[in-house]
Amino acid sequence: MELIEKHASFGGWQNVYRHYSQSLKCEMNVGVYLPPKAENEKLPVLYWLSGLTCNEQNFITKSGMQRYAAEHNIIVVAPDTSPRGSHVADADRYDLGQGAGFYLNATQAPWNEHYKMYDYIRNELPNLVMHHFPATARKSISGHSMGGLGALVLALRNPDEYASVSAFSPIVSPSQVPWGQQAFAAYLGENKDAWLDYDPVSLISQGQRVAEIMVDQGLSDDFYAEQLRTSNLEKICQEMNIKTLIRYHEGYDHSYYFVSSFIGEHIAYHANKLNMR
């Protein structure tokens, strides 16, 4: 991994690395925050998945998470949201193509050559992190919007691999809303059964489980009613007896002003779960 940025932050280092991804067949950037204790010991890892139009920079520059990661001794890994490059398929819209990988494995041309974000996040990136950084095998996952969707899907499909999962403003029923329907049709084809593998509410209804889900949702979020539908997740978790910590916040929108307001509580939540044995 090639170091391309290095910034001192809260006694640790906010770095950005570039590497070639075998899963995605392109160069990828990834933000890695190493707290002070990483100098002398191995630490657990929180993976953060960002939303539509984002890259590795949004979370590391806007959330203020470094303060809390340093306090709780957690390495934070923030990858890009899709494969990148002039040779990678793209679309002339913000919600499909580069910047909109949806954390799935595409099966349809032209997307299936590079868009394997599920494999990248689940397998390739953790292996790189374990090899290059002082990381233990303990990991949790979180994200925002499209990234919240990705975090929920990865945790629900691999409950033994993640100590905890949380999300800000996640797309919880992508097969039922425009963002998800458009992306899934392009990436996965018209067989809607294939879509359900990447739909958190559907996965839970089929019996997939995690111990607990934490979600924060702003009630002034312009996308809440049409695209996010947090109440669908709350309802299915109640029906399936999955413990939740779902909080609704008056006045908060879909932006990083919202994420930065509550990221400290999410990191504390994950720290507690990561330190349990």
Curated annotation (Swiss-Prot):
An example GO BP is: formaldehyde catabolic process
UniProt entry keywords in alphabetical sequence: Hydrolase, Serine esterase
Q: What is this protein called?
A: S-formylglutathione hydrolase FrmB
Q: Which organism is it from?
A: Escherichia coli O6:H1 (strain CFT073 / ATCC 700928 / UPEC)
Please provide, in alphabetical order, the Gene Ontology terms of the cellular component aspect for this entry: cytosol
EC numbers listed for it are: 3.1.2.12
Q: Which InterPro entries match?
A: AB_hydrolase_fold, Esterase-like, S-formylglutathione_hydrol
- Provide the function of this protein: Serine hydrolase involved in the detoxification of formaldehyde. Hydrolyzes S-formylglutathione to glutathione and formate.
User: What Gene3D superfamilies does the annotation carry?
Assistant: alpha/beta hydrolase
Reactions mediated catalytically = S-formylglutathione + H2O = formate + glutathione + H(+)
Q: Which family does it belong to?
A: Belongs to the esterase D family.
UniProt KW Hydrolase keyword: yes
Residues at the catalytic site: S145 (charge relay system), D221 (charge relay system), H254 (charge relay system)
Which EC class is the enzyme in?
hydrolase
